[in-house]
């Protein structure tokens, strides 16, 4: 019987894999705690101590803990340390779901980041959006900048990470 798995490329070992072509580099950003928060975001902010509505596509996130805006009533809380909020429904009117294993995070950095963004999406990188949820290379991702304008993070469903990695390998801007 034919082995159909032979026609697909092997998934990279994301813990060590890096791409670097020209002035853009891509790597996996591991070790982040990710919580999907749905519901009353004002109550979430009070309980978590994270203020604001979260960054949207193209906006710059900073700090050890921050929020990424997905929709009017939904954010992804991201942090280097675990959050002191338990998963599940909270009587204050919000629900928390741990997404650490569900979302893969790529960090893309370099002066040609704008060209890569233009290649992957129709988003105008000069016009930040309230929501970080965009279609990038045909996959739904959360896109925002981190720390400065030449570094971005993409959160993608873990099952789509090998596809997005292959797309990034073949992108002519890299």
Language-model features: locations:
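Basic, glycine/lysine-rich polyanion-binding surfaces/domains
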Residues: 1-174
């Amino acid at each position: 019987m034919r082995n159909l798995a032979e026609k697909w490329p092997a998934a990279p070992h994301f813990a060590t894999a890096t791409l670097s072509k020209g002035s853009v580099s891509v790597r996996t950003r591991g070790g982040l705690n990710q919580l999907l928060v749905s519901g009353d975001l004002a109550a979430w902010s009070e309980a978590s101590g994270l203020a604001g509505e979260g960054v949207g596509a193209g906006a710059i996130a900073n700090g050890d803990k921050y929020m990424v805006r997905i929709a009017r009533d939904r954010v992804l809380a991201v942090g280097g340390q675990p959050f002191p909020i338990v998963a599940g429904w909270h009587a204050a009117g919000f629900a928390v779901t741990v997404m650490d294993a569900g979302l893969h995070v790529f960090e893309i950095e370099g002066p040609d980041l704008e060209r890569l963004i233009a290649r992957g999406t129709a988003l105008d990188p000069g016009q930040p959006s309230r929501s970080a949820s965009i279609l990038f290379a045909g996959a739904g991702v959360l896109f925002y900048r981190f720390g400065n304008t030449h570094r971005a993070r993409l959160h993608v469903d873990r099952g789509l990470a090998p596809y997005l990695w292959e797309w990034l390998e073949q992108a002519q801007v890299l």
